[in-house]
Regions:
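An alpha-helical, amphipathic repeat domain used for nucleic-acid recognition
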Residues: 1-159
Length: 159
């Protein structure tokens, strides 16, 4: 069995910079990766301080970019975005601030998605499946129900 080689400060710093070449990371993500690579706790803290001093890592800007990608590309709702950001080790106050500053109308995003998912099928089984799917995506029950009701109304009156 091969034991992990311990990394000193310079090796840990190089490894962290290599990780950051590919994509931005949160502090916690980078810390966890360096721990797994074999860096000592005090070296990890020093590396993180070094990276913060040069603004290579910034949890607030990381959270903004990541939340934007989750909302725009993956069409996640606020609840799922909160969960994903907390998994990345972002502080709850930063998460709340990022979500407050993000300008989006849930109904504008959700209604076309629900319409596509239902595709005119308003049977109870299809609606329940649709609700479960969008709850998983992070939307609230009320938001989903409002979108379904709006689509039903549009279908009835062919708006």
């Amino acid at each position: 069995m091969q034991t992990k080689k311990e990394l000193d400060f310079n090796q840990a710093k190089e490894k962290a910079l290599r990780y950051l070449e590919f994509r931005s990371h949160s502090e916690k993500e980078l810390s966890d990766k360096l721990k797994r690579a074999g860096a000592k706790e005090h070296d990890i803290e020093s590396v993180l301080e070094f990276l913060k001093s040069y603004n290579f890592i910034n949890d607030h800007s990381f959270a903004e970019k990541y939340a934007h990608d989750l909302i725009v590309l993956k069409k996640f709702g606020k609840n799922r975005v909160k969960l994903e950001l907390s998994k990345k080790g972002i502080a709850s106050d930063i998460i709340c601030e990022v979500l407050e500053n993000f300008d989006w109308e849930t109904e504008d995003i959700l209604t076309p998605l629900v319409s596509k998912k239902l595709a005119g099928d308003f049977q109870k089984k299809s609606i329940d499946r649709c609700i479960r799917y969008f709850l998983y995506k992070g939307y609230s029950y009320d938001e989903i129900k409002t979108s379904i009701d709006k689509i039903k109304t549009e279908e009835e009156y062919d708006i």
